[in-house]
């Protein structure tokens, strides 16, 4: 059965390989299953996040081992998460293994250095992760990606490394990150500080196809057509439908929208709109109306 992560590898794929290896090697019983999630460092939850993000289904605890973002309903993007994602993964894997692991114990630990690989699955390309994360605002996926950036930069895969890791990755772009504070990969922390101009400059790189940023452009939700913008830019703003490509943002203290506008007159505009404070859902409509005005104005607004 497909989860929200379409065509991703499944535990059953791994279990089939393990059972095949066991059959070929005369193994009839698995006594112990050890779950190694040490790729990511603790804590699994950022101190400034509200636990309602977890119980209401917007964010899982950040562990390197979990199944379908630890969703109660793997087919629903927004679905309650638990406080035991690693243990849940172990439970599901034991079940997938079937009779051979019926009496196996399951515990968390670290992979021994002399271990032999008997089965493996590989994730989809990171480009697929990025596109899905952008389309539906998958917070868990965003946290994973941030930690992979940290690992690539030679840092620990932890909340404490994300700020430096992202700034280090942005160095070649020449974007000025002075004053930028990044507490997490998902943007859920209200202690993050990223000025709108920083996002606008980033979107300029996306528009121009800097490095491999084209994957970001391909993943941006489209006004009234896809992802988190599929139900927005209707009514009086319908003329902007299909012409605004942008990432949505929402926490209790703000709504944001940042991206690219293919304006009515053909001009490409980069924008970032923040509505901060004690905001209501109606702020999204106001943001959309302002972005639509940008679309209509086109080159009159361009500062280049």
Regions found by a protein language model. Give the residues of each.
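Solvent-exposed coil/turn segments that connect beta secondary-structure elements
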Residues: 1, 38-40, 51-52, 68-72, ...
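Periplasmic/cell-envelope proteins involved in peptidoglycan metabolism and beta-lactam response
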Residues: 1-71, 289-292, 296-297
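Short, glycine/proline-biased beta-turn/loop segments that scaffold the active-site neighborhood
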Residues: 35-46, 50, 103-116, 222-224
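Envelope-exposed proteins and targeting segments
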Residues: 29-31, 59-63, 102, 141, ...
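Small-residue-rich helix-loop
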Residues: 150-304
């Amino acid at each position: 059965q497909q989860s929200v992560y379409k065509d991703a590898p499944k535990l059953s794929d791994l279990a089939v390989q393990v059972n095949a290896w066991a059959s070929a090697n005369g193994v009839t019983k698995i006594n112990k299953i050890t779950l190694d999630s040490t790729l990511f460092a603790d804590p699994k939850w950022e101190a400034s996040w509200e636990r309602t993000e977890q119980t209401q289904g917007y964010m899982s605890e950040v562990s390197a081992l979990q199944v379908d973002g630890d969703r109660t309903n793997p087919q629903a993007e927004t679905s309650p998460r638990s406080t035991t994602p690693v243990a849940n993964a172990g439970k599901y894997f034991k079940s997938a293994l079937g009779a051979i692991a019926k009496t196996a114990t399951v515990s968390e630990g670290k992979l021994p250095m002399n271990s032999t690989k008997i089965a493996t699955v590989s994730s989809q390309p990171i480009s697929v992760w990025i596109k899905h994360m952008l389309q539906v605002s998958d917070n868990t996926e965003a946290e994973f990606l941030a930690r992979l950036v940290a690992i690539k930069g030679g840092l620990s895969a932890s909340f404490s490394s994300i700020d430096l890791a992202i700034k280090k990755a942005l160095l070649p772009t020449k974007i000025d990150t002075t004053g930028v504070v990044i507490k997490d990969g998902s943007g859920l922390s209200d202690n993050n500080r990223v000025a709108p101009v920083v996002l606008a400059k980033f979107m300029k790189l996306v528009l121009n196809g800097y490095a491999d940023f084209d994957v970001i452009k391909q993943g941006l939700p489209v006004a009234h057509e896809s992802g988190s913008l599929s139900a927005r830019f209707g009514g009086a703003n319908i003329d902007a439908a299909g012409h605004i490509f942008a990432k949505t943002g929402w926490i209790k203290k703000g709504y944001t929208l940042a991206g690219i506008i293919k304006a009515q007159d053909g001009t490409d505009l980069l924008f970032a709109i923040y509505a901060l404070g004690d905001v209501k859902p109606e702020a999204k409509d106001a943001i959309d109306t302002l972005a639509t005005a940008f679309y209509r104005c086109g080159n009159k607004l361009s500062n280049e």
